[in-house]
Amino acid sequence: MNITNCTTEASMAIRPKTITEKMLICMTLVVITTLTTLLNLAVIMAIGTTKKLHQPANYLICSLAVTDLLVAVLVMPLSIIYIVMDRWKLGYFLCEVWLSVDMTCCTCSILHLCVIALDRYWAITNAIEYARKRTAKRAALMILTVWTISIFISMPPLFWRSHRRLSPPPSQCTIQHDHVIYTIYSTLGAFYIPLTLILILYYRIYHAAKSLYQKRGSSRHLSNRSTDSQNSFASCKLTQTFCVSDFSTSDPTTEFEKFHASIRIPPFDNDLDHPGERQQISSTRERKAARILGLILGAFILSWLPFFIKELIVGLSIYTVSSEVADFLTWLGYVNSLINPLLYTSFNEDFKLAFKKLIRCREHT
């Protein structure tokens, strides 16, 4: 999301990069771009070629991967050219297109994290009822909503830029922050509101999970086999929710068979007669859930928060930053598109198997 404001000539007067510096920067950014492209392609191919992954929750992850792939293919390469050349030489029209695609895709990527968190929240707090509502059509509607909101957030500058052909100047491709209201509107809609929602949702998810773990740990004996099946379903449901891609469909009874067959962590059962043992397993699961949620939230916040703090500070004319700082913070945000496919699939066994299958197919071709 390349939204930079260089308000004074002094802010533009920076030391030119040496050839060595340009080469190092270029190689680093090319590696990031390549990895982002390959990892997101792998997620898309894994979901597309693995029938077991054809679930509504994974459609959201696939859409996130498509969005991050667009960032890698359409946004990052032009940013590399711009940074290495120290000036924009690709014309006014391409500048307009690039800025619009940049803002739309980055905003859409962030909003995808929001709907994934919302999907998980509903899945863990209202598992049975939401399993019936969790369909491909609902996932498609959520994806369409995300793209619509992203367009409404990122497109307004096109309307006033069309009347200002001399700004930005031909050598620069930046969005000028002379509309304070839009700066506040765009930063709130693209980051601060989604961040607040994500924090609230994952906080509630963690406490709901902790409560379920404690309830599981406190039950000494299961009354009958039917009750055991229901509790096992809840345990599997919970585990898969925190393993990032849960497998709920519209039919909870058939999904129980899949959960029961694929669960890796055994539920609390009659063998755990000692309260200390039950408490230890419950605490282990709580720590694992907290660790995964911490990684997801930490990666998102560390990637994008510095950029959007800079946007508000610069947009409100509190402080100006150099182009190097602006570029660094922009690429720190882009790196989130590299991290997303790792975080949202690495904790799931079915994704791991799908990736191994793709690698084996690649070796045989």
From Swiss-Prot:
A motif (NPxxY motif) lies at residues 340-344. Residues 1-21, 85-92, 158-179, 317-322 are extracellular. Serotonin binds at D102, C106. It comes from the Eukaryota. One of its GO terms (cellular component) is plasma membrane. Glycans are attached at N2, N5. GO terms for biological process: adenylate cyclase-inhibiting G protein-coupled receptor signaling pathway; adenylate cyclase-inhibiting serotonin receptor signaling pathway; chemical synaptic transmission; G protein-coupled receptor signaling pathway; G protein-coupled receptor signaling pathway, coupled to cyclic nucleotide second messenger. A motif (DRY motif) lies at residues 119-121. GO terms for molecular function: G protein-coupled receptor activity; G protein-coupled serotonin receptor activity; Gi/o-coupled serotonin receptor activity; neurotransmitter receptor activity; serotonin binding; serotonin receptor activity. Its main location: membrane. Residues 46-59, 119-138, 204-291, 346-365 are cytoplasmic. Belongs to the G-protein coupled receptor 1 family. This is 5-hydroxytryptamine receptor 1E.
